């Protein structure tokens, strides 16, 4: 891989979240939570957003903690790709 391609790949945004749905084919829904400080009151509030991410091999299951990376649009709602598994889901 050339140096320019390497830096372009590293400039993509990455987020870490939890898989909340794996019912679609080659797609997982990832819930990303982040803490933001309220502008007036100063209290930290938990904000969350769901992203559809591409899972080529259908290998990620519900409850897995994954890292997703921004990519080209693959469908109307899907422009993120799962890059790696951070932590597997614990089976109780």
Curated annotation (Swiss-Prot):
Coiled coil: none annotated. One of its GO terms (cellular component) is cytosolic small ribosomal subunit. It comes from Cupriavidus necator (strain ATCC 17699 / DSM 428 / KCTC 22496 / NCIMB 10442 / H16 / Stanier 337) (Ralstonia eutropha). Gene3D superfamilies: Nucleic acid-binding proteins. PROSITE patterns: RIBOSOMAL_S17. GO terms for biological process: translation. The keyword Ribonucleoprotein applies. GO terms for molecular function: rRNA binding; structural constituent of ribosome. Keywords: Ribonucleoprotein, Ribosomal protein, RNA-binding, rRNA-binding. The keyword Magnesium does not apply. Part of the 30S ribosomal subunit. The gene is rpsQ. One of the primary rRNA binding proteins, it binds specifically to the 5'-end of 16S ribosomal RNA. It holds the Pfam family Ribosomal_S17. The lineage of its organism: Bacteria, Pseudomonadati, Pseudomonadota, Betaproteobacteria, Burkholderiales. It comes from the Bacteria. Belongs to the universal ribosomal protein uS17 family. This is Small ribosomal subunit protein uS17.
């Amino acid at each position: 891989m050339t140096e320019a391609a390497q830096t372009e790949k590293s400039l993509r945004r990455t987020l870490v979240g939890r898989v909340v749905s794996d019912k679609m084919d080659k797609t997982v829904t990832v819930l990303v939570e982040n803490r933001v400080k309220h502008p007036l009151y100063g209290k930290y509030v938990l904000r969350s957003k769901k992203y559809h991410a591409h899972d080529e091999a259908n290998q990620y299951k519900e409850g897995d903690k994954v890292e997703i990376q921004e990519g080209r649009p693959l469908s109307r709602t899907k422009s993120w790709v799962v890059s790696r598994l951070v932590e597997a889901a614990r089976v109780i």
